[in-house]
């Protein structure tokens, strides 16, 4: 296929798609150029159906450091495991694509996005999402797309599509919305306490922009798209299905309606084991034994799926007996752990999360060195999901994509209410340990995080709570569920997580298994989530009504001062000599950022105060009209140089030493004398003039005697040091400098 180029303008930037030139052995490949960001996307599919009971889709987002003109960090100087941002972007692309494959499709599909050049003002992740959909759509892979996604900001009351870096920094909203031309099917967002109305407006305007991108994709597919391959789908034997339903459906229905999770799981598993044993014996010698037993397992799964949905839509009863808008029993505890800087334990039904707070100096911030310019990350929220939380054995090791994603969601929800660095000069880490799980553990971790922050004395703006909403839809009718449990998440159509304060939403995340949901469903889900959020906040505020006024005794004491950026080198000194001396003298630790924020921490408050005094002295600046106790450090014919403080000297001109005339500076001061001086002038080069006489009483005007002659002039004021007399003088030398 020859190279073809397609071009349009989207959100004020040029969008160019190239096909038929590179990666031609993949089932589908495109090069997407958005602004100066360039992403190569290749999609491939296995020839045969994979084993297993799930669709093996893998989406990668690979950040090549050369794309930003940078070397990879580390000893090897080569890209290694994906960064957290790359992992989150891969999940972001996977989620709207996954529902667009047919039920029963089991061939392995890989979609690989490689960032070849990076423009921070033109979203490479959105280009990758566009490219992923387009590569699948023009390929022979049976993908029921296209889909597209956009980023949405909210600046000065205006909705902005794909905001620039500068706009994103000012935005009150960081939203990614994806979908088909008919409906939204994925949402990911952080927000600064925005109302449900603003969030809904942003979602709908984002979807309008999505439609533009889909229309562009359809134009390209019409020009270069391949015919879709005929692929075997997983279908169960209809006669076998009817036989099992007739014999065992009533038993399975009773098992599904057991309210307690572990008892329900045991009851349903007992039915499945019974059916499996019957058919293993019946078809033990059959040549298609493996296929038959696979069908049996799939039929039992479909029966459980159908019964859960029937209970909710027809009987209006949930598996655990709750109403559709009812939250499970809640419990909140603070100070669960001693010694730590803060802890909170939050329980919702059979979902339980423990959050532990750690505070540290700013030197402990995480340095993020990716495609964007390097920056320091002050707040971290980590989420751990051990297998014992669901009563199972399993893999232990580094966090997977799910744990990284849930941690990031909690981080977005809580980051919106954290105090500024000036208000609270600490690095903050929260770790959520999921101790029990029966659905919505990520939202439990947000609630537990709020408890830990408040108990630890972190002055957050407001408590944050989170709730997960679900959906059961048959295409014509739907039911929105509040606080979904694991079974409802597994067999339902939507997992819509909403976190926020009483004043507004701080985070959204939505994943669906159908091809999209309507504005009507979104509106109802947001309203229902708000009601539930307030109920949870009532419980949190009853447990700890306000942030504690003091940090835990075990938390480090930190104080901060702000210095001018051009003074940083003075505090650090040549080769770090000055700052090392301060640390050695006081025993504190000191962090200085590029904006001039100096953080000093120690367990000893007196040591912190001493270090602050030293640093304040180093960066102190003289000001006109201020008075200083200064030491004479040098004498010249035209005056004396005095040290005001640290390395700051001033000149006291001979004419500014006394109200009476003198021809020798040494008659008034000597090196080492301490004198009071007042700053009278600072020139544009920073040179300082000071005066001694400005602090002395002005002598009265000379009086005339009867002959009209002036009386003798008054004696000069005696100097501080009176160990030797001062010589009188009669001549006034010419002033020179």
From Swiss-Prot:
E.C. number: 2.7.7.8
UniProt GO MF annotations: 3'-5'-RNA exonuclease activity; magnesium ion binding; polyribonucleotide nucleotidyltransferase activity; RNA binding
A GO CC term attached to the entry: cytosol
Database matches in SMART domains: KH, S1
Span list, region Disordered: 691-737
Membrane is among the record's keywords: no
Domain of life: Bacteria
Compositionally skewed regions (Basic residues) per UniProt: 715-724
UniProt GO BP: mRNA catabolic process; RNA processing
List of residues binding Mg(2+): 489, 495
Alphabetical UniProt keywords: Cytoplasm, Magnesium, Metal-binding, Nucleotidyltransferase, RNA-binding, Transferase
Its biological purpose: Involved in mRNA degradation. Catalyzes the phosphorolysis of single-stranded polyribonucleotides processively in the 3'- to 5'-direction.
UniProt record similarity statement: Belongs to the polyribonucleotide nucleotidyltransferase family.
Name of this chain's protein: Polyribonucleotide nucleotidyltransferase
Gene name linked to the record: pnp
């Amino acid at each position: 296929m020859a190279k073809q180029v397609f071009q349009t303008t989207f959100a004020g930037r040029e969008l160019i798609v190239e096909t038929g030139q590179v990666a031609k052995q993949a089932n589908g490949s495109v090069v997407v150029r958005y602004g100066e960001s360039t992403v190569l996307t290749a999609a491939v599919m296995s020839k045969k159906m994979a084993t297993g009971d799930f669709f093996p889709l893998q989406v990668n987002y690979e950040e090549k450091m050369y794309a930003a003109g940078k070397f990879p960090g580390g000893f090897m100087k080569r890209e290694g495991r994906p960064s957290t941002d790359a992992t989150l972007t891969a999940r972001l692309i996977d989620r709207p694509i996954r529902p667009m494959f047919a039920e029963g499709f089991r061939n392995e599909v890989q979609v690989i996005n490689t960032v070849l050049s990076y423009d921070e003002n033109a979203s490479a992740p959105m280009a990758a999402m566009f490219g992923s959909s387009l590569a699948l759509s023009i390929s022979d892979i049976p993908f029921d797309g296209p889909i597209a996604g956009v980023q949405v900001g909210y600046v000065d009351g205006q909705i902005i599509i794909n905001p620039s870096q500068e706009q994103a920094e000012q935005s009150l909203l960081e939203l990614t919305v994806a979908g088909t031309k008919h409906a939204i099917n994925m949402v990911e967002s952080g927000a600064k306490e925005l109302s449900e109305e603003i969030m809904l407006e942003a979602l709908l305007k984002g979807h309008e922009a999505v439609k533009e991108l889909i229309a562009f994709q359809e134009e390209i597919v019409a020009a270069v798209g391949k015919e879709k391959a005929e692929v075997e789908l997983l279908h169960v034997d209809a006669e076998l299905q009817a036989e099992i339903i007739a014999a065992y459906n009533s038993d399975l229905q009773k098992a599904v309606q057991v309210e307690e999770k572990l008892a329900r799981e045991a009851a349903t598993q007992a039915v499945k084991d019974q059916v499996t044993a019957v058919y293993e014996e019946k078809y033990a010698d059959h040549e298609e034994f493996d296929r038959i037993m696979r069908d049996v397992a799939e039929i039992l799964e479909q029966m459980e799926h159908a019964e859960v949905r029937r209970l909710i839509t027809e009987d209006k009863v949930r598996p655990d007996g709750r109403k559709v808008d009812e939250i499970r029993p809640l419990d909140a505890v603070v100070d669960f752990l001693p010694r730590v800087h803060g802890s909170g334990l939050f329980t919702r039904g059979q979902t339980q999360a423990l959050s532990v707070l750690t505070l540290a100096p700013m030197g402990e911030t995480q340095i993020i060195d990716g495609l964007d310019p390097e920056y320091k990350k002050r707040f971290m929220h980590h989420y751990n999901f051990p297998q014992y939380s669901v009563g199972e054995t399993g893999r232990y090791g580094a966090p997977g994509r799910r744990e990284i994603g849930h941690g990031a969601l909690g981080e977005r929800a809580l980051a919106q209410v954290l105090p500024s660095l000036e208000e609270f000069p600490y690095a903050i880490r929260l770790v959520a340990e999921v101790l029990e799980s029966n659905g919505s553990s990520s939202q439990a971790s947000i609630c537990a995080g709020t408890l830990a922050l408040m108990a630890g004395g972190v002055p957050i703006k407001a408590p944050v709570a989170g709730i997960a909403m679900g959906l059961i839809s048959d295409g014509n009718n739907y039911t929105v569920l509040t606080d979904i449990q694991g079974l409802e998440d597994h067999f339902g159509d939507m997992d819509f997580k909403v976190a926020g304060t009483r004043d507004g939403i701080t985070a959204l995340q939505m994943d669906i298994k159908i091809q999209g949901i309507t504005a009507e469903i979104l509106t109802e889900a947001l309203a229902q989530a708000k009601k539930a959020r307030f109920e949870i906040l009532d419980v949190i505020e009853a447990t700890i009504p306000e942030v504690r006024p003091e940090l835990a005794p075990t938390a480090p004491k930190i104080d901060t001062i702000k210095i001018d950026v051009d003074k940083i080198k003075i505090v650090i000194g040549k080769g770090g000599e000055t700052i090392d001396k301060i640390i050695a003298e006081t025993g504190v630790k000191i962090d200085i950022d590029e904006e001039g924020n100096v953080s000093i921490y120690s367990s000893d408050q007196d040591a912190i105060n001493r270090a602050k005094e030293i640093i304040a002295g180093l960066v102190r600046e003289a000001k006109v009209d201020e008075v200083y106790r200064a030491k004479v450090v040098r004498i010249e014919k035209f005056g004396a140089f005095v040290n005001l403080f640290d390395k700051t000297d001033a000149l006291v001109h001979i004419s500014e030493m006394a109200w009476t005339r003198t021809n020798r500076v040494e008659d008034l001061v000597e090196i080492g004398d301490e004198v009071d001086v007042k700053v009278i002038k600072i020139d544009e080069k920073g040179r300082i003039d000071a005066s001694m006489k400005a602090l002395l009483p002005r002598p009265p005007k000379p009086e005339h005697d009867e002959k009209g002659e002036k009386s003798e002039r008054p004696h000069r004021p005696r100097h501080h040091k009176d160990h030797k007399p001062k010589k009188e003088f009669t001549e006034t030398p010419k002033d020179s400098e």
